[in-house]
Amino acid sequence: MTLVDNRNTSEPYVNLAIEEFLIRHGDCSHQDFLLLYINQPCVVLGKNQSIYKEVNFEFLRNKQLQLCRRISGGGTVYQDKGNLSFSFISQFSESKINNYRLFNQPVVDALRKIGVDAVMDERNNIICKGKKISGNAQFTNRKNIISHGTLLFDADLNLLRNCLKENDFKVESKAVSSVRSSVMNMKDATDKISHTEGLKEYLKRDLKADSILQFTEEEWNAIVKSAADKFKSFEWIYGRSPLTTITKPDIEIEVEEGIIKDIRHKTQDARQLIGTKYEFNEIKKALENSKACDLLKSIF
């Protein structure tokens, strides 16, 4: 197993770009790669999810967290310094598709050695005492395949629940929806490791990551550029959201690819927003010099 040196970055967009770079350019013909990283507080959506359905609007409005989207499917996850993310990148094989046990069993075994009663459930999550400690997803380009997941060690579970809680108004979309689960932190199940960095170092050893991949400056610059140009862009984070209908008191809004496609309100003033990005600051800016500025609270 070859450990990927991510230069100890906690920038979620950079770590997401590293994963895509390895999928597209990694030589997995003679080695498998392991990427371990700890992100700054963020919410990460699956590739095919609607951001408006998955994330609580209070958080969307106040921008309290970085919002991200990964290249794999699956559900939305919250990450912070109390969460360790792991990614296995290997050469593609049909037998690896949805074979989460192949990738996750070594992680489960490692956790059990430190006293965490970890098992895999029928949804391919890793659970402990009936509660979820790890969600997982996969992506392949038929050259390489990535199977990656989260490990809740000492995350802010109140923040997790608040930013992912359902809104108190109707949000409809045919996008893939997250399956909400009870969660727990592993720190409550082991006294052998005291912090997330300790878990990271332990997994390096137990998973036998005995060689290191270091990116050249040219490769690193390409990764950082991809993080800025793609993974941090409105088009990727918001724009990949499928058609979503938001129904609030006295107003109905249709949003597709992050853009207001239609809006129904008792006044005609709201229709000026058709074609506007459905994002709080964009709508606020569009309404600043309008008689309909009081619409802002109704719309977002």
Model-predicted regions and their roles:
Residues 128-137, 253:
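A short beta-strand motif that forms the metal-chelation/ATP-contact edge
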Residues 6-9, 92-100, 148-150, 185-193:
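Flexible, glycine/proline-enriched loop segments at strand-loop-helix junctions
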Residues 21, 107, 114-116, 134, ...:
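Long, positively charged amphipathic alpha-helical accessory segments at protein N-termini or as interdomain linkers
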Residues 83-124:
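Contiguous, small/hydrophobic- and glycine-enriched helical/loop subdomains that border
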